């Protein structure tokens, strides 16, 4: 046992929290000690919520967003514009775009971007299901809203080639987002403007 910790149980709990992205051991220690001070019912509710989420959460069969049902609330909402699809990397990006209140279409979550260095290729992403949605004929515009990174640009280009020849407008969010920035960390105003001011994708955006 690390002599820094008075308890092996505490050390183990801190170690588990420290596995979370963006959580160092100091932050993990604060979180664990905070939970330790709470009533047992509070801690059990926290744990049960995580277990229930893991076992019962679903992924939308249409867009791959997280959902409580087979089809997410966005895809099943008749008030949304089904002729427009905003392509994003992750579920967090859907939440970021929704927070802008500037977009009323549907989404398509790829589950990542093409990154050979990380061993992620096109077949590891939800690209073919996007192509199938466009082939359905109802989609008139696909908005590429991936991060302004080399991997994001590579994925944009690949998608553009897959959709080449189809009767669909392909656009990309405006570059109000700095190069290298990830969508989820962009402020709502900037992201909203980037969507509104989107431009046609030329392969060099």
From Swiss-Prot:
Record keywords: Oxidoreductase included? no
Q: Which residues form the Toprim domain?
A: 83-178
CDD domains on file: TOPRIM_recR
What are the UniProt keywords, alphabetically?
DNA damage, DNA recombination, DNA repair, Metal-binding, Zinc, Zinc-finger
Q: Name one GO molecular function term.
A: DNA binding
**PROSITE patterns on file:** RECR, TOPRIM
What SUPFAM superfamilies does the annotation carry?
Answer: Recombination protein RecR
Q: Which Pfam families match?
A: RecR_C, RecR_HhH, RecR_ZnF, Toprim_4
Instruction: Give the UniProt family note.
Output: Belongs to the RecR family.
Q: What does this protein do?
A: May play a role in DNA repair. It seems to be involved in an RecBC-independent recombinational process of DNA repair. It may act with RecF and RecO.
Protein name, entry field: Recombination protein RecR
Which gene is the coding source of this polypeptide chain? recR
